[in-house]
Amino acid sequence: MKTIRSMVLVSSDPVSMQNGAQAVFTRLQEEINGFGLQDEISLVMMGDVGRHDALPIVVVYPEAVIYGPVNPDQVHFLVEEHLYKGRIAADLLASSRELSGRIAWLAA
């Protein structure tokens, strides 16, 4: 039985797709496989994240780290640092300005 230790989500709304989300997703698959992590990492596309200034974004759980905007050339570093070595790839983090905004569960 496989034990998934991390889930990686890639935004796939229209703006993300226009900004290269599919290429980021494909490169993530390649790098995850290249590091032999395919049995430990779940990789999926997610819908609209409600932000359009840091797209595409990559979210890594269980840490809930948000990277963005991410381009395919940055994926090797992200996978090596965060998923392989277990360190936050600080250079790729989405800025706090891009993460601020209405919190969905507080908006009734």
Question: What does each model-found stretch correspond to?
Answer:
Residues 1-108:
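Feature of Fe-S/electron-transfer and energy-metabolism proteins
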